[in-house]
């Protein structure tokens, strides 16, 4: 097949391939052969890196709500602000400490640039804290060295080392606070690896990194510049060359400029990282920080405990939306409104069959469905494990088929339609969606079903030519049955009698008196619930003249439900003929 694509005409000559800017060579890479088996150390940076990117930065009340959420979910390292950058951030750090809001097993993290007055102010904000991470950073990339700082490699290294020494100096003012240091060569992805490791190792030496006093070296994709495999190669290269490696906690801080932040984090973790920084639902500058929800639940669906509680994902989303004053996208993995929703007919049918197989397999294994291995097509996770219901799993539009329609009727109304009846009713729905367009809600679908198959509940409703009233039966010695029934025909109530080898056959005899030729082709019934007051649903496939249609009857009496189903099929056939 010929490729008909043509040049775009866009100014591609203005952009430089990454490999022409930064060299990352690792022919003996080992990360592709590894698999993730446990969760990393997490650090949530919503309150700083996320907050700085908001149109309306969080108020103190919204910050506290976000902090409480992160603690409740199980995050043990939380970046809470840049206290030397604003009075608001300084005051919030003080509020957390003085108000005793920080659990003993949670470590707050504060950010600072490598300037003495900023570092001094940072340490002032931490007075009284039990433990804290002081996060020092300066930019090291080729572009920022040239454009922003107008400094060579040695000049940028001096900035980092001066900042590290000042941190150690002011640490002496916090005798009762255990300080862990973190250093980030900002814009790491735009920095030569040999230079990045030179700076990081020099800073780690000043911080006296050791197995007993580890230093966090954080390698940010401040701007995502290449494919995730390149980021992973750079992380493995750094992991091999950082020293002392046992004294280093290697941390990742991916952004999502190319849309692959999650993949970069996962591959970077395989490549030797120990820790990942990010935000819930990927908030952050430009296209955002890496999404901690996606990362954590990607592990969960692989049978790995993320060490974070996502069991009420809707509450997490609502809180994040309130605090950030930004919506979470409907297609956002795991948390969006539509992520567990199937509109496609083939998808719906597979999901329906998957649920049925799951129940069957769990019963055969003697286990509750909630404890059985989850395997349902198109649903990588059980929505109930995230606090969701199955209500929105299947929704109906013009792309839907019988599986989705049948699923909704069964789950919302306990109606288990026979396969051919499913096909027939899905055609009714398809005709409606093709005509009107849009989605058919569960309530609308039920209304359409009632209008099509069941007697109208409205006094002035015109359901069809026939309506069944009270009846009685008699059985003679030969087993033949006589049906005495009150039937409404064209709005007029009449008393009719018919005979046959059962109640349905007797009703067909009555209908035959009006010249209505009916043959029953298929029949099934089931209870709609359990207990003495349970109602039954009956489904009857009838040939009425040249038309083959299904009827449905619902009643607390099984005989009545079957007779109603025949009337339903006959009325539908007559309506169809008149149309």
From Swiss-Prot:
Matching entries from SUPFAM superfamilies are given as: 2-isopropylmalate synthase LeuA, allosteric (dimerisation) domain, Aldolase, post-HMGL domain-like
Q: What Enzyme Commission number(s) does the record list for this chain?
A: 2.3.3.13
Q: How does it assemble?
A: Homodimer.
Function (record text): Catalyzes the condensation of the acetyl group of acetyl-CoA with 3-methyl-2-oxobutanoate (2-ketoisovalerate) to form 3-carboxy-3-hydroxy-4-methylpentanoate (2-isopropylmalate).
In this chain, the stretch annotated as Regulatory domain covers 456-579
Instruction: Supply one GO BP term.
Output: L-leucine biosynthetic process
UniProt protein name: 2-isopropylmalate synthase
Co-factor requirement: Mg(2+)
SMART domains associated with the record: LeuA_dimer
Spell out the subcellular localization from the entry: Cytoplasm
Q: Which InterPro entries match?
A: 2-isopropylmalate_synth_dimer, AIPM/Hcit_synth_CS, Aldolase_TIM, IPM_Synthase, LeuA-like_post-cat, LeuA_allosteric_dom_sf, LeuA_N_DRE-TIM, PYR_CT
Annotated Pyruvate carboxyltransferase domain ranges read: 40-314
Question: Is this entry keyworded Amino-acid biosynthesis?
Answer: yes
Keyword Zinc-finger attributed: no
Q: Which NCBIfam families does the annotation name? A: leuA_yeast, PRK03739.1
Which domain of life does this protein belong to? Bacteria
**UniProt lineage:** Bacteria, Bacillati, Actinomycetota, Actinomycetes, Micrococcales
- Disulfide-bonded cysteine pairs: these are none
Pathway(s) it belongs to: Amino-acid biosynthesis; L-leucine biosynthesis; L-leucine from 3-methyl-2-oxobutanoate: step 1/4
Which GO MF terms are attached to this record? 2-isopropylmalate synthase activity; acetyl-CoA C-acetyltransferase activity; magnesium ion binding
Q: Which reaction does it catalyse?
A: 3-methyl-2-oxobutanoate + acetyl-CoA + H2O = (2S)-2-isopropylmalate + CoA + H(+)
Pfam families named in the record:
HMGL-like, IPMS_D2, LeuA_dimer
Which keywords annotate this record? Amino-acid biosynthesis, Branched-chain amino acid biosynthesis, Cytoplasm, Leucine biosynthesis, Magnesium, Metal-binding, Transferase
Q: Which residues bind Mg(2+)?
A: 49, 253, 255, 289
Chief location of this protein?
cytoplasm
